[in-house]
């Protein structure tokens, strides 16, 4: 499969303005933090972000003007940090369009993309306002004539995922919960992996069952020790609570958010403490 290694800047330079990007991880865990920071530094514009449950990644990209649309089931920090202030301001002001989902409808859309079908049935939407809010349609089950809601295929242009280990051919190993990363890799047109370490491919050949993301799906792999930060990355580090608390406080107002971004991201490459 060849050597797919690239620098972080090279890999993110292949992401065009207006792309639909699926970001791996979930809330504050194993998100592609280094890649998100590089997207900010490269001043991408007009992006659509796809994620079941986003937090710092979506919040920061909204604060920096990178995002036009967010398709997600949830955006917020949970834990002690509360809501995502920059995301909320961007949506309330009309700068960002929130395409509301349930986490299950994001997953169903990705599965439709994987299977090459235009839509996927989803149970459990009856009685909610989500179909009306999003225009999800109901169709007749051909076997029972019961009405079932379906969601359209959700095809990311690029999936950006952080893994604990990868080899130069792009095979990626995830330790712990995989979240929706495997679905994103299978559904996307292109895949970029960032990895805590690049290891000898022989280790993957000896235990192929440990490969979560096969190299034939991957277009670029980046050596990025600490590349999930400020998200957690089991078993290497937890999420950076002091940094996240500082960001959430700064993100409450556009001026303080700009100052934070200028001092912590644009003029430096953050690394885990």
Please identify what each model-predicted range represents:
Residues 1-273:
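Conserved alpha/beta enzyme-core scaffold
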């Amino acid at each position: 499969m060849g050597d797919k290694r690239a620098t972080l800047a090279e890999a993110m330079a292949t992401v065009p303005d207006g792309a639909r990007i699926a970001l791996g991880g979930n809330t504050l865990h194993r998100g592609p933090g280094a890649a998100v920071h590089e997207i900010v530094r490269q001043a991408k514009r007009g992006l659509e972000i796809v994620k079941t449950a986003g937090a710092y990644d979506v919040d920061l990209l909204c604060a920096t003007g990178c995002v036009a649309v967010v398709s997600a089931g949830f955006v917020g920090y949970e834990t002690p940090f509360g809501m995502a202030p920059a995301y909320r301001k961007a949506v309330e002001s009309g700068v960002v369009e929130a395409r509301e989902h349930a986490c299950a409808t994001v997953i169903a859309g990705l599965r439709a993309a994987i299977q090459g079908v235009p839509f996927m049935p989803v149970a459990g939407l009856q009685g909610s306002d989500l179909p009306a809010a999003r225009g999800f349609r109901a169709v007749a089950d051909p076997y029972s004539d019961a009405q079932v809601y379906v969601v359209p295929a959700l095809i990311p242009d690029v999936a950006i995922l952080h893994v604990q280990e990868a080899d130069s051919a792009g095979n990626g190993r995830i330790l712990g919960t995989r979240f929706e990363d495997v679905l994103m890799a299978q559904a996307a047109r292109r895949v970029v992996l960032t990895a805590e370490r690049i290891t000898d491919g022989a280790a993957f050949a000896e235990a192929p069952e440990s490969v979560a993301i096969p190299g034939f799906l991957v277009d670029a792999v980046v050596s990025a020790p600490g590349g999930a930060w400020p998200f957690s990355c089991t078993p290497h580090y937890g999420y950076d609570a002091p940094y996240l608390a500082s960001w959430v406080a700064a993100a409450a107002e556009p001026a303080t958010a700009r100052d934070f971004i200028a001092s912590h991201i644009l003029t430096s490459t953050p690394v885990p403490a």
